[in-house]
């Protein structure tokens, strides 16, 4: 295991070679920082992508364990999360990396099946509770605020086997049970809670295209054994939204007054730019938002689905009962978590027929997502085929959310740059990640601009601290500030780690918050 002294030597060498390059890349023309002293700068992770130890100390099988083992061909490199970054055994080393970066927060998630191997149909795994207690305590000891997500795509396989997980209202009970246990055991120290990560993205991949477990879909969206892409995504989303409200109800009525924390939800966002100035394309861009991020955020904030969805889907969209609407309005989020990576052009498919593609169907809002407008790209393409670099779209997205949701506090819970490891890619090339630095620099400048516009943003978490298991990409796409050798699990800081460290130092003085 790498020692702290080795980290110090590596960062010293980078600091001698890198400062001139770094200083040229960031800072807008206005060098004043809009970040207040209590702003959270951190990195983000998730349990399945990081922990490994997939059957260690009483952990049960989860949906991703089963999916990756039974369908290795669905993962680009045929890999799984059995070991991942092995953070379960190496979290102290990773906390040293965070501490050296100067971050004052770390976003992590709870492995549902590590705490409750069989959901509410089995016993609590107190070895799992102990692991998270140790991790939380170690973070706090170093002055790093834990920002904890209750559910980040993974759940006990038992719940899929019993009642098809998110397709059943029973899942709301199980999620409430998990939330109660986590608040009880960790809430005296955890003051920032996220209920569910990216319900919109999770549902689209699991129940529309069938690319994520439980791999349910129908033609023409995907080729699955079971599922209905026209109806099941909306059923699953309905249950996730109500499970979110259930968790907040438990926190508000049993824990928040004493524990004095806050709780919210995370959605995936993309900026949707109309491909022309026509009214049809402008309306389509708004529909695209309604069928993507607003699908989740409108019920969470206003207790109802967006009008565009109601008008277009009719009876295919579940309805909230009066009691459910009351619950949503009574137990609102304290903040919104915003994950953001890219932008798209949007072409209307409601009035004018257009080619099939992402967004073009009725269940997706009849708003086709495109990355080009004639010969003009929405932004430079990264190694990840869905990610284009468009910092101005990020600024527009934050202002859109500010205006639509009355400037409720926001945290940028994920933002990062993906780099593909090709057969010819060298470790040296991965460590000298200048494209990632340019991406982060542009998006953080856009964040500054949005905050000067008045967006009420309270924190920023780079995705990700480490290279990790990136779902369908396996270990072939790297988002980390630290390189991971997945044979030895050695962590090595990339140039972007030094850049992010310098950015934090230059924008917020948080040294008094960190126990060096």
UniProtKB/Swiss-Prot annotation:
SUPFAM superfamilies the record matches: (Trans)glycosidases
Enzyme Commission number, as recorded: 3.2.1.21
Catalytic reaction list: Hydrolysis of terminal, non-reducing beta-D-glucosyl residues with release of beta-D-glucose
GO terms, molecular function: beta-glucosidase activity; coniferin beta-glucosidase activity
Binding residues annotated for a beta-D-glucoside, in chain numbering: 49, 152, 197-198, 341, 414, 463, 470-471, 479
Residues annotated as signal peptide: 1-22
Active site: 198 (proton donor), 414 (nucleophile)
Recorded family membership: Belongs to the glycosyl hydrolase 1 family.
Protein name in the entry: Beta-glucosidase 46
Protein's organism: Arabidopsis thaliana
């Amino acid at each position: 295991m790498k020692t702290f002294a080795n980290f110090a030597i590596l960062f010293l060498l980078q600091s001698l070679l890198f400062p001139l390059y770094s200083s040229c890349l960031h800072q807008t023309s206005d060098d004043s920082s809009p970040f207040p002293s209590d702003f959270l700068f951190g990195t983000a992770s998730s349990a399945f992508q990081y922990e490994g130890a997939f059957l260690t100390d009483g952990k049960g099988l989860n949906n991703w364990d089963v999916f990756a083992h039974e369908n290795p061909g669905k993962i680009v490199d045929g890999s799984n999360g059995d070991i991942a970054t092995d953070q379960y055994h190496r979290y102290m080393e990773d906390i040293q990396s965070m501490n050296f970066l100067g971050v004052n927060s770390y976003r992590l998630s709870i492995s549902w099946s590590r705490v409750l191997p069989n959901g509410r149909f089995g016993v609590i795994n107190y070895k799992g509770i102990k692991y998270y207690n140790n991790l939380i305590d170690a973070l706090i000891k170093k002055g790093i605020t834990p920002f904890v997500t209750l559910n980040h795509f993974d759940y006990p396989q038992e719940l899929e086997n019993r009642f098809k997980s998110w397709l059943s209202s029973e899942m709301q009970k199980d999620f409430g049970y998990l939330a109660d246990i986590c608040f009880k055991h960790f809430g005296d120290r955890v003051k920032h809670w996220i209920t569910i990560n990216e319900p919109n993205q999770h549902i689209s991949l699991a129940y529309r295209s069938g690319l994520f477990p439980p791999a349910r879909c129908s033609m023409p969206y995907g080729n699955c054994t079971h599922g209905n892409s026209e109806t099941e995504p909306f059923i699953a989303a309905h249950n996730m939204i109500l499970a979110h409200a259930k968790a907040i109800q438990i926190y508000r009525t049993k824990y928040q007054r004493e524990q004095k924390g806050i709780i919210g939800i995370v959605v995936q966002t993309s900026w949707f730019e109309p491909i022309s100035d026509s009214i049809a394309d402008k309306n389509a861009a708004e529909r695209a938002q309604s069928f993507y991020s607003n699908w989740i955020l409108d019920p969470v904030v206003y207790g109802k689905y967006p009008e565009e969805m109601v008008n277009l889907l009719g009876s295919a969209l579940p309805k909230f009962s009066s009691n459910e609407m009351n619950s949503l309005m009574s137990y609102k989020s304290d903040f919104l978590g915003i994950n953001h990576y890219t932008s798209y052009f949007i072409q209307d498919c409601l009035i004018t027929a257009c080619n099939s593609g992402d967004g073009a169907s009725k269940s997706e809002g009849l708003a086709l997502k495109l990355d080009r407008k004639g010969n003009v790209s929405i932004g430079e393409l990264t190694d990840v085929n869905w990610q284009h670099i468009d910092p101005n779209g990020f600024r527009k997205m934050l202002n859109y959310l500010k205006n639509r949701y009355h400037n409720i506090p926001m945290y940028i819970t994920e933002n990062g740059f993906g780099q593909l490891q090709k057969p010819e890619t060298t470790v040296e090339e991965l460590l000298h990640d200048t494209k990632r630095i340019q991406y982060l620099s542009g998006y953080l400048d856009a964040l500054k601009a949005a905050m000067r516009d008045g967006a009420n943003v309270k924190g920023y978490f780079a995705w990700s601290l480490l290279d990790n298991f990136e779902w369908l990409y396996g270990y072939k796409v790297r988002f980390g500030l630290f390189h991971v050798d997945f044979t030895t699990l050695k962590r090595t800081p990339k140039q972007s780690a030094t850049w992010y460290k310098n950015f934090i130092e230059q924008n917020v003085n948080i040294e008094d918050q960190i126990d060096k």
